[in-house]
Curated annotation (Swiss-Prot):
GO CC annotations, alphabetized: aminoacyl-tRNA synthetase multienzyme complex; cytoplasm
Family label: Belongs to the class-II aminoacyl-tRNA synthetase family. ProS type 3 subfamily.
HAMAP family xref list: Pro_tRNA_synth_type3
Localization per Swiss-Prot or TrEMBL: Cytoplasm
UniProt superkingdom: Archaea
The protein's name: Proline--tRNA ligase
């Protein structure tokens, strides 16, 4: 099965997301998918809170005249803005944009709050819906008209040094987040022609999907003083002088959820990282005539033992065990524990890992400790497998002065191995013309195994 077909199929069958809403590019998070989203963003919120960010919430509606202040920035997506033009039947004097991103709203308010150097640094974030009139082919959780989960952080600082340090903190924070949810990444400094409009520079996280295309999963932007000058974000320095603040912003969206689904899944269905799994352990009673009560009493006891540490579900449906196995493998539940009369007699339980399919017999009396060990192995294995999978998609090519010859080799490699091609840096190929020659994207400058490369790939 092709990856795109697998992806659409699994979102529906595993109860992640329903596309049947009557607006292109808009869908519904189903309960199981919403829980994956919730646990993922809880990790992100914790990382942000621990590094001094404060969560807030800004309006969705932006007056046209305020949005226009963004100048260069708004040019990057002015054709994608949704507009509210009427209140009931009455035309509005000023059109209102549905938030495409929040620089305008947040920086307008920051101007009200930042007056002197003691008001800095200011580190805010929100998790909100954003809207883009996507005209390209939309994909669930990947390319949407309503992005339902957009985490955007915006910070303001007194000095360039503090601003640069914030970029490093943001990169470290995002590394920790993607490591936690088991999504491998390659970090690139985006080229000038592909950076965030209005930024000094952009750093981006990309992962590689099973079809060999790359997906941008996170971005970190150093805005310098560019937006501060537009929005007159001035403050009084310790010397009594006036200066503009230095700013950063960084975002992660539903693509993080799409990626943890895509990177780990297999022919049986989802393989969910433990920390974001709605159900971490499913218990399956193996019932035999005359032994039902013994098994159910024991497995309920096991449920009570485990639920103090894990999210556990006891599947007591009146259907065959094999169907239960298939259902929970499809949903990617990390561990399955089977318990039958013979297991109880022998003082054992059988644990089955979703990532490897390995069946492990453990002592029932020591089951909590055994489960904790297996969960730890599951986490490490999932991370290593994903990293190895991504590494297998990376090809390093030597630079050649003959750009046409090099471009043909790049195209051949992209067809053969797909993924990311790394080429030693040379100015002659670091341009949009080279993108056209290779019919792919220049992701930017990437450090790989201690060396700097130009990274190119086919992207979503």
């Amino acid at each position: 099965m092709e990856f795109s077909e697998w992806y659409s199929d699994i979102l529906e069958k595993a109860g992640i997301y329903d596309l049947r809403y009557p607006i292109k590019g808009c869908g519904v998070y189903l309960p199981y998918g919403f829980k994956i989203r919730r646990y993922s963003f809880e990790i992100l919120r914790k990382l942000l809170d621990e590094t001094g960010h404060d969560e807030t919430l800004f309006p969705m509606l932006i007056p046209e005249n305020l949005l226009a202040k963004e100048g260069e920035h708004i040019k990057g997506f002015e054709d994608e803005v949704f507009w509210v033009t009427h209140g009931g039947k009455t035309p509005l004097e000023v059109k209102l944009a549905l938030r495409p991103t929040s620089e305008t709203t947040m920086y307008y308010m920051m101007k009200q709050w930042i007056k002197v150097h003691t008001d800095l640094p200011l580190k805010l974030y929100q998790v909100v819906n954003t809207f883009r009139y996507e005209t390209k082919h939309t994909r669930p959780l990947i390319r949407l008209r309503e992005i339902m989960s957009f985490k955007e952080a915006h910070t303001a600082h007194a000095t360039k040094k503090e601003c640069d340090a914030q970029i490093e903190e943001a990169l470290t924070l995002y590394k920790a987040f993607f490591d936690e949810i088991g999504v491998p990444y390659v970090i690139s400094k985006r080229p000038e022609w592909d950076k965030f409009p209005g930024a000094d520079y952009t750093m981006a996280f990309d992962t590689i999907y099973p079809d060999g295309k790359t997906m941008q999963i996170g971005t970190v932007h150093n805005l310098g003083q560019n937006f501060a000058k537009t929005f007159e974000l001035e403050f009084e320095t310790p010397d009594g002088e006036k200066d503009f603040v230095y700013q950063t912003c960084y975002g992660i969206s539903d693509r993080a959820i799409a990626s943890l689904i895509s990177v780990h899944g297999d022919e049986k269905g989802l393989v969910i990282p433990v920390d974001v799994a709605p159900i971490q352990i499913v218990l399956i009673p193996l019932l035999f005539k005359g032994k039902e009560e013994i098994v159910m009493d024991k497995i309920k006891e096991l449920n009570n033992t485990l639920k103090s540490e894990f999210r556990v579900h006891l599947d007591d449906r009146d259907i065959r065990p094999g169907r239960k196995y298939n259902d929970w493998e499809l949903k990617g539940v990390p561990l399955r524990i089977e318990l039958g009369p013979r297991d109880i007699e022998n003082g054992h339980a059988l644990i089955v890992r979703r990532d490897t399919g390995e069946k492990i017999t453990v002592e029932y009396s020591n089951i909590l400790e055994e489960v904790e060990k297996i969960v730890s192995m599951y986490k490490e294995n999932l991370k290593l497998k994903a990293e190895e999978k991504v590494k297998s998609f990376i090809t390093v090519l030597d630079f050649e002065n003959d750009v046409n010859s090099l471009s043909e080799k790049v195209k051949a490699k992209l067809l053969e191995n797909k993924g990311i091609i790394l080429i030693p840096f040379n100015e002659s190929i670091y341009n949009e013309e080279f993108e056209e020659l290779i019919d792919a994207s220049v992701l930017g400058l990437t450090t790989y195994e201690g060396k700097e490369y130009i990274s190119v790939a086919r992207t979503y």
